[in-house]
């Protein structure tokens, strides 16, 4: 029972950490990365599809993304989706390939992105604390129902705190890495 509560908490913490990683991957740095655009939604074939289902995205140079649609008829729709996104990048297309030149970030934009990274990390920490609180409530319920002893409850609380601390350190590391990436010129 205690192990089930701890396993569930760890699983949810892992998901929160992955969600942060995925979200931070979409934040633009001075470097080109397919993660910047792969989840953009494109109106094609009468539906809205993620870009990575319509094209291959490559990085031929550190500041260049090349998008090669599987179907040349989707080039205009993909360009439109990129223009409508908040990336601030203008696509150039030759009818079959789309090139995205990633401009250098200004100092003000870097600081703005750093604040955004910190805010996302803090939101994830709040999510971890909420997961911990819910797990603590579950453990308390088990103790009140006499399914576990007070000692087992205390040991489980300590394990849960260690788990939370480990994931908070991981979130801090992910955030620091992304901040360094954003501030890199």
Curated annotation (Swiss-Prot):
One of its GO terms (molecular function) is ribosomal large subunit binding. One of its GO terms (biological process) is translational termination. It comes from the Bacteria. The keyword Cytoplasm applies. InterPro entries: Ribosome_recyc_fac, Ribosome_recyc_fac_dom, RRF_sf. It is found in: Cytoplasm. Gene3D superfamilies: 3.30.1360.40, Ribosome-recycling factor (1.10.132.20). Keywords: Cytoplasm, Protein biosynthesis. GO terms for cellular component: cytoplasm. Belongs to the RRF family. NCBIfam families: frr. Responsible for the release of ribosomes from messenger RNA at the termination of protein biosynthesis. May increase the efficiency of translation by recycling ribosomes from one round of translation to another. This is Ribosome-recycling factor. It comes from Roseiflexus castenholzii (strain DSM 13941 / HLO8).
């Amino acid at each position: 029972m205690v192990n089930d509560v701890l396993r569930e908490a760890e699983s949810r913490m892992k998901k929160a950490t992955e969600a942060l990683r995925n979200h931070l991957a979409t934040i633009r740095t001075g470097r080109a990365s397919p993660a910047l655009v792969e989840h953009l939604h494109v109106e094609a074939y009468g539906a809205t599809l993620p870009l990575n289902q319509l094209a291959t995205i490559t990085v031929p140079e550190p500041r260049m993304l090349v998008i090669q649609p599987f179907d040349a008829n989707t080039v205009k729709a993909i360009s439109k989706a990129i223009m409508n996104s908040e990336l601030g990048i203008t696509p150039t297309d030759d009818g079959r390939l789309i090139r995205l030149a990633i401009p250098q970030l200004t100092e003000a934009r870097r600081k703005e992105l750093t604040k955004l990274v910190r805010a996302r990390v803090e939101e994830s920490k709040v999510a971890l604390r909420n997961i911990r609180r819910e797990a603590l409530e579950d453990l308390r319920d088990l103790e009140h129902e006499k399914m576990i002893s007070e000692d087992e409850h205390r040991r489980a609380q300590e394990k849960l705190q260690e788990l939370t601390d480990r994931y908070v350190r991981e979130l801090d590391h992910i955030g620091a890495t992304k901040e360094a990436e954003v501030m890199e010129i």
